[in-house]
């Protein structure tokens, strides 16, 4: 999927103005996705349009009477609204307000590019709007693209966020208040599923670690008490318990605690070692 800074939605009848606007945006360093093809509707073509909207940070709609008469333009706008994209309505020609069925356009401040407006001033306003909270908007786009891919793959866990990507998503989500556009339901579900997946993976890795510690302690016990039994005194064997007992206590604690946690396993191991030490120091002399 191609990522872009701007997707321009427009009526073909407004192409001369759109070409001027596009050239100005490109000259300003913006990556613009725009469909110049005047071809009949097809599923392949519409998939390309849909993916371009999914992968853009800002959706600019060129408002005019012809825009609202175009089925394609209205369909593009519906997709942008559904994905919770940042939409910048750009007024090119005055139109009958009753022809606008979009609530999002009605609620957002427009950038005016009509014949009576100064293009340079309007363009400066447009650039400022595009650049507002740019890090947030780009994160929103990246997250949406990955969330859609995860959804299209039937929520396959191999498409989850992990490591630094998950930490970044959690950090951005924590600071979402006051940001536009807000995360949509799919994006939130994707972060939540990634968190759950990361927790499951961590538990699985910890179980493997604990099992390895358990095997180590058992091997040590076998070596000390079976292979070396004839060569060691009872006192020596008791003292050698410090070789295998910590690992055994750590492994059993880690595997049996309700939540797998290195910290909890270490605490449990410490408690066992203290109790054993007290037993050894206080009672061994009487046995």
Cite the ranges covered by each PLM segment.
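Long, domain-scale regions corresponding to catalytic signaling modules most often appended to membrane systems
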Residues: 98, 116-216
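Short acidic-hydrophobic, aromatic-tinged amphipathic segments that line or gate anion-handling sites
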Residues: 111-114
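Juxtamembrane boundary at the C-terminal end of a transmembrane helix
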Residues: 277-287
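Conserved N-terminal substructure of TIR/SEFIR domains
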Residues: 1-65, 81-86, 95, 117-121, ...
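Interfacial loop-to-transmembrane junctions
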Residues: 259-274
């Amino acid at each position: 999927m191609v990522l872009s800074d701007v997707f321009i939605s427009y009526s073909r009848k407004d192409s001369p103005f759109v070409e001027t606007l596009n050239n100005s945006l490109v000259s300003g360093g913006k990556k613009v996705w725009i469909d110049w093809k005047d071809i009949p509707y097809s599923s392949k073509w519409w998939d390309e349009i849909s993916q371009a909207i999914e992968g853009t940070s800002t959706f600019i709609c060129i408002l005019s009477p012809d825009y609202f008469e175009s089925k394609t333009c209205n369909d593009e706008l519906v997709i942008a609204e559904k994905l919770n994209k940042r939409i910048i309505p750009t007024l090119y020609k005055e139109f009958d307000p009753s022809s606008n069925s979009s609530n999002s356009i009605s609620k957002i401040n427009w950038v005016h590019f009509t014949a009576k407006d100064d293009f340079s001033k309007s363009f400066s306003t447009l650039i400022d709007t595009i650049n507002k909270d740019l890090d947030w908007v780009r994160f929103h786009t990246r997250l949406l693209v990955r969330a859609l891919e995860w959804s299209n793959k039937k929520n396959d866990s191999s498409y989850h966020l992990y490591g630094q990507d998950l930490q970044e998503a959690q950090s951005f989500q924590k600071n979402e208040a006051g940001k536009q556009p807000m995360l949509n339901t799919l994006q939130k579900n994707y972060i939540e599923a990634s968190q759950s997946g990361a927790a499951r993976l961590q538990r699985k890795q910890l179980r493997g670690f604990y099992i390895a510690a358990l095997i180590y302690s058992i091997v040590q016990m076998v070596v000390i008490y079976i292979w070396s039994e004839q060569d060691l005194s009872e006192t020596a064997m008791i003292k050698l318990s410090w070789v295998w007992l910590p690992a055994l206590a750590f492994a059993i604690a880690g595997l049996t605690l309700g939540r797998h946690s290195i910290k909890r396993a270490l605490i449990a191991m410490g408690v066992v070692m203290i109790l054993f030490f007290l037993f050894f120091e206080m009672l061994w002399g009487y046995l």
